[in-house]
A protein has these predicted regions:
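N-terminal strand-loop-strand
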Residues: 1-25, 52, 56-59
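Active-site-adjacent beta-strand/loop module that shapes the phosphate/pyrophosphate-binding cleft
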Residues: 2-5, 62-86, 101, 117-125
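Generic structural "secondary-structure junction" signal
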Residues: 9, 25-27, 32, 62, ...
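Nudix hydrolase/Nudix homology domain
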Residues: 16-22, 32, 90-165
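The catalytic Nudix box helix
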Residues: 25-57, 77
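Extracytoplasmic/secreted proteins and extracellular or luminal domains
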Residues: 50, 69-70, 89-92
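Acidic/polar loop patches that form or flank catalytic/metal-binding clefts of enzymes
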Residues: 55, 86-88
Length: 165
């Protein structure tokens, strides 16, 4: 979301379950071995062309029996866009735009799920990417905690200068 409270939203080309596609947040699946923050930045860039910096997890949901009898966990990340220039991915996306957040939340065309996850991002600082010293390396683990717990006494900011295999 921008400082002016504009929200980056997409409309996919294909609806789920035979429904018409509606405006929603960009997103997708993590690649094997990919950290969550990197995945959120990558998915937004792939779908919209907008480069953004991951800041925190606003909320997440778990869905039992999603596919193949497995549960699905969906994370909503807060990002800070570095530009507002859109280059839409045309293979999967039919529309991409910056929308005033109040219009998004007030729209009858937006699902209640999407409205509530955006409210969570607006009304909370979320949990931030961190690292607990002594429990593996940052190349294979990451932790998400309230920012005030990252105090240097065993919980530190997640390093940005490591090589991920």
């Amino acid at each position: 979301m921008t400082p002016e409270r504009d929200l980056l939203v997409v409309r996919e080309k294909f609806g789920v379950g035979g429904r018409e596609p509606t405006l929603k947040l960009p997103g997708g699946a993590l690649l094997a071995g990919e950290h969550l923050g990197q995945a959120v930045e990558r998915e937004v860039l792939e779908e919209t062309g907008v480069k953004a910096v991951f800041e925190s997890i606003a909320c997440f949901r778990q869905w039992h029996g999603y596919r193949y009898g497995k549960s699905d966990i969906y994370f909503v990340g807060k990002l800070r866009p570095l530009s507002k220039e859109i280059t839409m991915q045309t293979a999967e996306i039919q529309e991409c735009l910056w929308m005033p957040v109040d219009d998004f939340i007030g729209s009858d065309a937006i699902s209640n799920f999407n409205k509530q996850i955006v409210r969570a991002a607006l009304e909370s600082d979320g949990i931030v990417q961190s690292f607990i010293e002594g429990f593996g390396g940052p190349e294979s683990r990451e932790y998400f905690m309230p920012k005030h717990l990252i105090d240097g006494s065993g919980v530190v900011p997640f390093p940005t200068d490591f090589s991920q295999s």
